[in-house]
């Protein structure tokens, strides 16, 4: 894969000749010394099926959480690794969606769980490193069976976001990444037919939405007033152009 820079390290994956599973590597920004953080080929040796789903690294660069599917059902275990000692934490998180997000305290991770029957992603939990999964806190449960939910961190590194989506509706909740114990706050309540995605940048959010145009427009709002009544048009919708996505950068 193409290396990407995160918090002073480049991260990428690579297949060695004859390998069925990749190596996951990193190196410091100004160094040529590679560090193998996961050896997929070696890890797969005891399993008939093996797939690494997702991984995330703590803000201090010292801890890695990663997910594994060894059942071929997209039901993942999450394991946590100390990248300094190369040793695993004692706990394993079972029956997850495979998605992982570190809070900025370097000791809390957010992850999703699936409905055991439908395999719909419907719960978001928080886990404190070094504790049993039975002690994890249910942060959000999506009871509407037409919606699925997942958690991620904004590109700004400032918010944990819980997204609930169906075919024609979206709803987001925000948790400050530096305060993972805070109750999630709704960005804009779900409405049938209202689709939107959010992108945080400095003191505001950019919103890609079909609120004012079926081909979507880009709106902005203050991070302190996020309801749709506060959205202001930034890029108008057009009949001849469908806006499919956007990204934000510090210097562009």
Where in the sequence are the language-model features?
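Beta-propeller folds
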Residues: 1-252
């Amino acid at each position: 894969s193409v290396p990407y820079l995160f918090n002073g390290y480049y991260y990428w994956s690579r297949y060695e000749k004859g390998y069925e599973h990749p190596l996951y590597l990193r190196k410091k920004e100004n160094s040529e010394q590679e560090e193998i953080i996961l050896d997929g080929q070696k890890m797969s040796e005891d399993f008939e099926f093996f797939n690494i789903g997702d991984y995330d690294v703590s803000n201090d660069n010292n801890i890695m959480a990663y997910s594994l599917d060894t059942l071929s059902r997209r039901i993942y275990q999450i394991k946590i690794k100390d990248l300094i000692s190369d040793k695993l934490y004692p706990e394993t998180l079972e029956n997850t969606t495979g998605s992982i997000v570190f809070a900025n305290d370097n000791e809390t991770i957010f992850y999703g769980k699936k409905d055991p029957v439908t395999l719909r992603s419907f719960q978001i939990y928080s886990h404190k490193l070094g504790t049993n999964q039975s002690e994890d806190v249910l942060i959000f449960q999506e009871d509407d069976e037409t919606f699925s939910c997942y958690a991620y961190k904004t590109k700004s590194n400032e918010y944990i976001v819980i997204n609930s989506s169906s075919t024609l509706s979206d709803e987001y909740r925000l948790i400050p990444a530096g305060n993972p114990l805070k109750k999630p706050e709704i960005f804009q309540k779900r409405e049938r037919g209202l689709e939107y995605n959010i992108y945080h940048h400095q003191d505001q959010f950019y919103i890609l939405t079909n609120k004012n145009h079926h081909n979507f427009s880009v709106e902005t709002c203050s991070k302190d007033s996020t309801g749709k009544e506060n959205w202001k048009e930034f890029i108008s919708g057009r009949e001849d152009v469908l806006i499919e996505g956007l990204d934000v950068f510090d210097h562009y």
